[in-house]
Amino acid sequence: MSVNPKAFPLADSGLTQQILDLVQQASHYKQLRKGANEATKTLNRGISEFIVMAADTEPIEILLHLPLLCEDKNVPYVFVPSKAALGRACGVSRPVISASITTNEASDLLPQIQAIKLAIEKLLI
């Protein structure tokens, strides 16, 4: 399991933990879409807060269309080291290569989502 050098920006271990915790909470609040195809749909519909991708995806090219789309739509994106850990955080028994946290104005998660978005945007600079 190796992290692909094309996976930029890669979250450090502290941020990865925060992101995975938020992904887990978002799945309880029904604010999570799992998989590259569903992440693409949320971007096209304009309901994505940010995108999380797995850096150990093989081949990584199957999700490299997402950063381009994120930049078009001005949505932050980040890579986490492990698809297995992302899958566990999503509450699925399989590895997940991509997930999208979706928008909900009345959500209890809004402050955490804003904090993570800010941290991701700092990585992109």
UniProtKB/Swiss-Prot annotation:
One of its GO terms (biological process) is snoRNA guided rRNA 2'-O-methylation. InterPro entries: eL8/uL1-like, H/ACA_rnp_Nhp2-like, Ribosomal_eL30-like_sf, Ribosomal_eL8-like_CS, Ribosomal_eL8/eL30/eS12/Gad45, Ribosomal_eL8/Nhp2. Its main location: nucleus. One of its GO terms (cellular component) is small-subunit processome. The keyword Cytoplasm does not apply. The lineage of its organism: Eukaryota, Fungi, Dikarya, Ascomycota, Taphrinomycotina. Signal peptide: none annotated. This is 13 kDa ribonucleoprotein-associated protein. The keyword Nucleus applies. Common component of the spliceosome and rRNA processing machinery. In association with the spliceosomal U4/U6.U5 tri-snRNP particle, required for splicing of pre-mRNA. In association with box C/D snoRNPs, required for processing of pre-ribosomal RNA (rRNA) and site-specific 2'-O-methylation of substrate RNAs. Essential for the accumulation and stability of U4 snRNA, U6 snRNA, and box C/D snoRNAs. GO terms for molecular function: RNA binding. Component of the U3 snoRNP particle. Binds to the C'/D and B/C motifs in U3 snoRNA. Component of the 25S U4/U6.U5 tri-snRNP particle, a subcomplex of the spliceosome. Binds to the 5' stem-loop of U4 snRNA. It is found in: Nucleus, Nucleolus. Keywords: mRNA processing, mRNA splicing, Nucleus, Ribonucleoprotein, Ribosome biogenesis, RNA-binding, rRNA processing, Spliceosome. Belongs to the eukaryotic ribosomal protein eL8 family.
